[in-house]
């Protein structure tokens, strides 16, 4: 199994302006990383009337238990006025 550099990955993830419902490519990016680690992946899009679709990434490794489930999010809080930042928040 390839080695994962967590700090490098965190820096790469932070660069995505993934403000819901726009994922800015972060789902495909993470899906590619997980596939390289041997995960089977699927991006599922949830649609609800009067709302923009939201994507979720489902990844599975192995076949037998015991099982571990991680639920998290890839979106960020809107940065507000970019002129108020001394550096690009992404």
Where are these regions (language model features)?
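A non-catalytic alpha/beta surface segment that caps or lines the substrate-entry region
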Residues: 19-65, 88-90
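Active-site metal-coordination/substrate-binding segment of hydrolases
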Residues: 67-90
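Homeobox/homeodomain signature
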Residues: 3-4, 9, 47, 64-67, ...
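N-terminal hydrophobic or amphipathic helices/low-complexity stretches enriched
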Residues: 1-23, 35-38, 80
């Amino acid at each position: 199994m390839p080695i994962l550099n967590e700090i490098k990955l965190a820096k790469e993830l932070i660069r995505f302006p993934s403000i819901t419902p726009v994922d800015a490519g972060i789902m495909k990016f993470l899906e590619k990383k997980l596939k390289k680690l041997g995960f089977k992946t699927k991006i599922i899009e949830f649609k609800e009337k009067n709302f923009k679709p939201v994507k979720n990434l489902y990844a599975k490794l192995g076949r037998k238990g015991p099982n571990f489930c991680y639920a998290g999010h890839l979106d960020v809080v809107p940065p507000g006025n970019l002129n108020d930042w001394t550096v690009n928040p992404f």
